[in-house]
């Protein structure tokens, strides 16, 4: 069938990519993904992160993703924003958020530093240029009001509250403890997911924090994991719609 043929081609292509990356590892002496097999590492490697976000072809902790991210953060950043010196020559909010998505998925708390950096770069109307001049903080390339950047911001906020990982829904993995310490109720949704729309609330309650959700599932309810940063992960029991996680306010 045509579907089986597509699957075969995808497997063969993935095998070619893996072989190429093995050769790159031997050449560079590190598990990194440059923009091309014979290219040095530079800011163009940002495109290789698509294997983790948004495609999720590579696992969350694949060293090829994480070492590439570390390279970009150490060598291609300005005031915690991703600085793209290939053509763009500016800080890229939407690509900074791509890195943040990789870190969020891997459970790396640095994701929030990047979110804050992008928030600080927003215009008074809540918009971002496609590339931002490092001195003036105004636009220096591309769209003045970059819709892609706005979309990535929405997706970042969405994934902080709810994101898919295989056959699971991960809730609250991007809700930092500083937000919980404000002792204010938070809510998000109804947010679209591959399992159906879901509405989420987060409520601090003394020494605990309560995560609750309601979903309009397309089929049966998926496996749900509540995973606040720095707190124990909790696998929800089916059909409960609520998880209580112990939270020490002094933490």
Pin down the residues of each PLM region.
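Active-site neighborhood of glycoside hydrolase catalytic domains
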Residues: 1-27, 59-60
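Active-site core of glycosidic bond-cleaving carbohydrate-active enzymes
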Residues: 29-165
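Non-catalytic C-terminal accessory modules of carbohydrate-active enzymes
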Residues: 109-250
